[in-house]
């Protein structure tokens, strides 16, 4: 008797792809296009993390009535994370960045 793995039986036999939404910020914008805007993957990580922190600080200061930081430069999606917003801003060339700062 041979047995088939459970994962194989869960795969649709008609070749249809699984139904799920592609998460934004992880695969969209594409990593290759983001890397073209910086000198290395490490520079991209620092660049995006700094901008995400600024966006997060902007949201946190809204309740205090202080407007020290610049908010999102792209229309944020419902429940979109600051890092995803930062990656979309970088992809859209809305930010200027000097490496080493």
UniProtKB/Swiss-Prot annotation:
Disordered: annotated span: 1-22
Low complexity composition bias: residue spans: 1-13
GO annotations of cellular component type: DNA-directed RNA polymerase complex
Reactions mediated catalytically: RNA(n) + a ribonucleoside 5'-triphosphate = RNA(n+1) + diphosphate
Keywords: DNA-directed RNA polymerase, Nucleotidyltransferase, Transcription, Transferase
TM ranges: none
Name of one Pfam family that matches: RNA_pol_Rpb6
Sample GO molecular function, one term: DNA-directed RNA polymerase activity
Top EC group: transferase
EC number: 2.7.7.6
Presence of the UniProt keyword Transferase in the record: yes
Domain of life (superkingdom): Bacteria
Stated role: Promotes RNA polymerase assembly. Latches the N- and C-terminal regions of the beta' subunit thereby facilitating its interaction with the beta and alpha subunits.
Subunit annotation: The RNAP catalytic core consists of 2 alpha, 1 beta, 1 beta' and 1 omega subunit. When a sigma factor is associated with the core the holoenzyme is formed, which can initiate transcription.
Similarity section: Belongs to the RNA polymerase subunit omega family.
Entry protein name: DNA-directed RNA polymerase subunit omega
